[in-house]
């Protein structure tokens, strides 16, 4: 049994102890990720700080546009809700993993901040992905629920923007 109160011996990569839910298709797999969705920026020295600051800035930007009435369509409102869930989920995880773990209690503020990471755990195998990234053996990069919320929000924001544009064109043609 793994002791998840200590950092993994190899750093913040995969703990490589999958729990197969649907064989060869879906598994739970604990992965420590200092980067963002799908491991982008993971293992870099700048990622923990940048990916702590960027979501905070994003929250202020979302608030600004919300007050300006930028999210009129139901798709856009749902997207903002999902985006906030994703931001707060990953932000909470990153702060908790950097500051609340027992092994970091004697570290300085900046050392703790630089140790922050999110826990990704959803791993799925896609039939075509090994053709794109042969080294993946078909396994999509491990992600978490917050990453899913952010990705779905991006699609909904795009669709909401299209719907709002269509509504404006119809209103102007009347």
Please place each PLM-identified region on the residue numbering.
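Alpha-helical transmembrane bundles and membrane-interface segments of multipass inner-membrane proteins
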Residues: 1-174
């Amino acid at each position: 049994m793994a002791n998840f109160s200590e950092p993994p011996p190899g750093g913040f990569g995969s703990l490589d102890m999958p729990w197969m839910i649907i064989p060869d298709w879906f598994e739970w797999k604990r992965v420590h990720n200092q980067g963002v969705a799908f491991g982008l920026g993971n293992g870099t020295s700048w990622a923990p700080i940048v990916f702590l600051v960027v979501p905070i800035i994003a929250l202020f930007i979302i608030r600004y546009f919300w007050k300006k009435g930028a999210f009129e369509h139901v798709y856009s409102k749902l997207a903002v809700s999902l985006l906030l869930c994703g931001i707060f989920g990953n932000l909470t995880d990153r702060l908790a993993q950097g500051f609340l773990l027992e092994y970091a209690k004697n570290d300085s503020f900046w050392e703790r901040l630089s140790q922050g990471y999110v826990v990704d755990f959803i791993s799925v195998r896609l039939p075509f992905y090994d053709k794109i990234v042969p080294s993946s053996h078909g396994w999509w990069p491990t992600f978490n629920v917050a990453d899913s919320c952010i990705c779905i929000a991006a699609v909904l924001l795009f669709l909401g923007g299209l719907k709002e544009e269509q509504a404006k064109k119809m209103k102007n043609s009347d």
